[in-house]
Amino acid sequence: MSTHSLDELFDRDGFSRRHIGTLDSTDLVEMLQVIGVESVANLIDKTVPEAIRLRTDLDLPSALTESEVTAELRQIASMNRPRRSLIGMGYTGTITPPVIRRNVLENPAWYTSYTPYQPEISQGRLESLLNFQTVISDLTGLPIANASLLDEATAAAEAMTMARRASKSKSPKFFVHEDTHPQTISVMATRAEPLDIELIIGGTDALRPDDIFGALFSYPTSTGSISDWSAQIAAVKVAGGVAVVVTDPLACVLLASPAQLGADIAVGSAQRFGVPMGFGGPHAAFMATTEAYARSLPGRLVGVSTDTEGRPALRLALQTREQHIRREKATSNICTAQALLANIAGFYATWHGPVGLHRIAERVQRLATMTAQGLKANGYELLHDTWFDTIAVRVPDGAQSVIAHGRSLDLDFRLIDETTIGLTFDETTTLEVLSDVLKAFGVDDSGSPEKFDAPDLGIPLALVRTDAILTAKVFQSCQTEHEMLRYLRRCSDKDLALDRTMIPLGSCTMKHNPRLNEKMARLPGFADVHPMQPQSTVQGALEVIEELADWLMKLTNMPAVAMTPKAGAHGELAGMLAIRAALIARGEGE
């Protein structure tokens, strides 16, 4: 005779039980005795004030089994349609090398390890993050790079506040060149307003070096041009300001470094180094700077030291800059890093090495050049005569029809304005894609887009990179799968993570996602969608966001939820700004 109910037989709580762990009645009694209470209800009585206690059941859906969750998430992912995206704007297609996907992204030795505050159990992670810093330092030409930030827009905002701390100018104004990604400008504006920073957004004619504490230039720009900003940067620095350059790490493989232009700070996103677009994140951003500004650098910084026996060892350096030590006087409230994504980006550069990165960068630039030549040969005008991976095409009488034709060919373009279309090429772009792009513009390539090849166009000769990059041994020795596999294993063997034992530390980072979550997040329907592709093609992602927001509103009894923060520190700042805005709205801004 069965002694189990149907719910017990279906094991509805099996998913959470296996993930969180079991707790039998004996364990529970012992725990309650240790803390001096009689029951869980008694514990709640002692800890949760009566006035705020919820007396009704939460209006949430019933729990699902692991197989049911899998089926539902696969169905939701199928509602998204990964496209051949040429939208760009800081998000590009990329290929995660299988050896890195299998041995880092899918390996709990890498994704369950804790923030490396204890260097004795973190040497592998610290080594990989030092590699990431070295990649960024080499590509930007600046001697110091941090171990990642949350995203490019946040990094730009952090660079602005860093410039204010470091600048000799007393001006509250900061210049941002108008051809910068719009989402970056938007985040900078949000950050600037409560700090009484006045953003001056415009072209070079709006630049007044004597009346600003710093300036930000994009290299390449959002619409694709490659400008030599060295004269503008020099003028800003002579006037006592700080110069920031937003850049693309793949572009820096071919272009003269930001340091060569005179930049004090360089920021950007490492997403295209092997990290899927993921409908906008998460991705690792970066920041690099000069020795003079090292102590103003936000985020974590891995440094080389020695252990008690005098052997080389790695550790987090200059931690007194960080919020967990310096609190309100910290260099930034954003203490979070994107360490796993930074590791992937660093290993991507290690896997390809300088030769492989140069091959990818040159291919991307050549595809953009071939498209530019094909369009110009058929009467189209380009907005710029320089480019790396992005071209802007004038279509005075039919931009919307070209966009629509592209969508019919499974292509997404950027509508810069009503008469201009942006096209961004990436590692995943093929000659077939190029051919279809030309078709969308009504250009017949006669099945041979190679006829438009022109290797020496797009990059000004004066801005061609001539110095070597990634000269360290690690970037020369891991270009075969078995070498990379062994290197990844050697690094992970130096670490302690949840695949070996519990870690007796507690913080906001100590959340171990079920393996299923990681697997579902890598489905193409979730991983390979651009954040700005048509809403009709990302209904699954929007459903997940809306459903999660609904659950959070019910859990918190709040009327609205903002889903944009990428980390706890982001959320804290967003919350404070929301409170501030509410007070201002009701006349209590002071």
Residue locations for each model-derived region?
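Active-site C-terminal subdomain of aminotransferase-like
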Residues: 273-378, 383-385
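Conserved PLP-binding catalytic core of the aspartate aminotransferase-like
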Residues: 362, 378-407, 425-428
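Short loop-beta-helix segment that forms the pyridoxal 5′-phosphate
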Residues: 117-121, 138-157, 552-575
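Conserved PLP-enzyme active-site core in the AAT-like
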Residues: 154-315, 375, 392-396, 404, ...
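Charged, compositionally biased N-terminal leader segments and the immediate start
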Residues: 1-22
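Conserved phosphate/anionic-ligand binding catalytic regions in large, soluble enzymes, centered on
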Residues: 275-288, 292-293, 337-341, 496-516, ...
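Gly-rich Lys/Arg/Thr-decorated short loops/hinges at beta-loop-alpha junctions or inter-strand turns
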Residues: 10, 107-119, 137-142, 168-172, ...
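N-terminal entrance/gating region of PLP-dependent enzymes' catalytic architecture
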Residues: 26, 30, 45-131, 137, ...
